[in-house]
Regions:
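Feature 926 captures the class I aminoacyl-tRNA synthetase adenylation module centered on the KMSKS loop
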Residues: 2-32, 37-136
Length: 136
């Protein structure tokens, strides 16, 4: 990551999920929706799984920052560092939205069409990646 501001933004975005978890955890039901199949059927997990979902962005942010340092072809990151930063930020936002959906569905089941939200997010990810890849 070339830009120091990008690192800060990525860490802030990654920290929002654990903050969301800390604020909502005491009020969550014992079973939290974690998985939606292709038909929209919900699988429920214990609250401990939600903690992992909240910590995952922090782990990925650390990995995204550490990977360019250990990659044998680390000099190639200079070619696409701006887009790498954007990708990292997008993934943090993606995971934050996923956590928000889980919290919303925990408190108000059926309020959000999870399949449509995830399809839109994956579609935006492919648009972003398809637009970015020809540039490096």
């Amino acid at each position: 990551m070339k830009n120091k501001h990008s690192k800060i933004i990525i860490w802030i975005l990654a920290a929002l999920s654990p903050i969301l978890c800390a604020v909502t955890y005491p009020f969550l039901p014992q079973q939290v929706p974690m998985h939606w199949d292709i038909n929209g059927t919900v699988s429920y997990e214990g609250k401990a799984t939600f903690i992992f979902m909240a910590v995952l962005p922090l782990l990925l942010a650390g990995l995204f920052i550490y990977l360019p340092k250990i990659d044998p072809r680390k000099k190639n990151y200079a070619k696409f560092s701006k887009y790498y930063d954007y990708f990292c930020m997008f993934m943090m936002v993606f995971l934050l939205i996923a956590n928000l959906v889980v919290v919303s569905e925990s408190f108000f089941p059926g309020r959000i069409s999870v399949g449509i939200v995830i399809q839109m997010l994956v579609g935006v990810l492919f648009l972003f990646l398809g637009n970015m890849m020809p540039k490096f």
